[in-house]
Amino acid sequence: MISFNTYRLKNGLRLLHYYDKNTQMVALNLLYDVGSKDENPKATGLAHLFEHLMFTGSKNAPNFDAPLQAAGGSSNAWTSVDMTNYYETLPAQNVETAFWLESDRLRYLNLTDESIDTQKSVVIEEFKQRCLNVPYGDLYHFCNDLAYKVHPYRWPTIGLTVDDIKNASYEDIKSFFAQHYAVNNLILCVSGHIEFEKAVALTEKWFGDFAPANIPVRNLAQEPVQTEQRILSVKREVPQNMLTMMYHMCGRRDADYQVCDMLSDVLSNGMSSRFYRNVLVKSGLFTELDASVSGTYDPGLFIVRARLTDGVSFAKAKEAIDAELADFLRTGATAYEIEKCANKYESTQLFDMLTYEKKGVKLCQYELLGDAADINKEVGKYRCITQDRLMNVAKNLLNPDNCSILYYGPDA
C-alpha cells in the first residue's frame, strides 16, 4: 500500500506527494497530458520535439542543466503517444532549484528561431538513426499504419516523416506549446525526503500565480471495428524475417485491460508459457516469439511478434502460431497459469516501485488515468481474473478478422 497526499491549486495544477524518510533526495515528476495523439496529422512529431525544446533554456535559466547540476541534480524526459514526462532528482536541501527551473521554462521557454532550428536538426538526426539507418527501424511505422486507419496512434511518437519535423512552422510550434503546456494540464508529483507542507508551499510559490489555459477538448477520431484481416508485406534486407500480428483491444482504462495483459503473459511470459514450451522450443521455427499489449490509454493493440529462424517461410511460421492460439482457445487457461501470472505481476509491480522516483512516475500516470489511488488497486484487478473471464476475452480478441499481419524482411 502506497500512502500519498494530494493537493489541487486554484489554477488546476494537480499535486501529488509521497514521503520517503529513507533517502536524502527528492524527485520532481511533471507529467503533461499531451502526447503524439494530440498532434495534427499533417504536423506530426511536435510532442517529441518539445521533449527536446524544453531543455533549451528559459529567460532566467539560459542553460537548464547548469544550475541543476550545481545543485547536485540530474534530469531527463520521455514522450509517448499519450503523455510527456519530465523529472529531476536532487538533494532535498536544494529542491527549490528544481521548482524554479520548471516554473521558469513553463513561463519563459526559449522558443526562438535558433533554438527551434537546432532542436529540429537534433530530432531529424535521431529520426534517421532510429528509423532509417538501422535494421527494423521503420517496422513500427508500418505496424501502426496497418493497424490504425483513423486514430492518431497510426503514427509513431517520433513523427510520421522527417518532412513533418522539418516543415513544422514557428507558429505551429508556439501554438502547440500554448495549447498543451499549462498548469491545468499538468500533474506534479514531489517524492522523497520532503514534508507535504513544504511541497505544497513550494508548489504554490512557483506555480500558484500561473493562469490556467484554454485546453482544447479532445475530439480524436475513433478507430472503427476491424471486420476483416489485413496483410502487408514489406521487403527489407534485415538479418531475420519478422512476423507481427496485431489484434485490436481495449484501452488502459477499460475493465478488461488487465485481462488482456494477463493473456499476453499466459502465452509468452517465461519458460513455462505456452509459446515458449509448445512453439519456440519444440518447433525450431523461431528465435524469438512473444506476446504483449501496447498499454495505450485509448484502445490499443495485442501484439504477437516473432523472429523467424533462417529458411522458415512466413506461411509456416504463421501456421504454427495460429495452431497454438487455436489450441489455447480450445483447451483454455489453467488456474495454475492464472495464479502464476498474477504472482508475477505483483512481484513486478513491487520491484517497479521500489524507489521514490518510480513511485512518483507511477502516481502521476494513475492520476492521468483517473485517480492516483488506483495504484493500490491494480494488483487486486489481476487477482480477481477467473478462467472463464480470461477465455471470454481471449475468444473475442483473437479473432482472425480482428488481426493485422505484417510480414517484414528479405523474404516478404
Q: What annotation goes with each model-predicted range?
A:
Residues 1-24:
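N- or domain-start disorder-to-order transition segments that initiate the globular core
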Residues 27-89, 155-158, 269-285:
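M16/MPP (pitrilysin/insulinase) zinc-metallopeptidase core fold and M16-derived inactive scaffolds
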Residues 12, 30, 48, 86, ...:
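Buried hydrophobic packing residues in well-ordered domains
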Residues 57, 89-122, 290, 294-352:
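M16/insulysin-pitrilysin zinc metalloprotease superfamily fold
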Residues 2-5, 149-150, 154-157, 182-251, ...:
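An aromatic/glycine/proline-enriched structural segment found at the starts
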Residues 1-6, 144-186, 218-223, 349, ...:
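Histidine-acidic residue clusters that define the catalytic metal-binding segment
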Residues 187-190, 307, 328, 336-412:
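C-terminal regions of mature proteins
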Residues 165, 244-248, 267-308:
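A structural supersecondary motif
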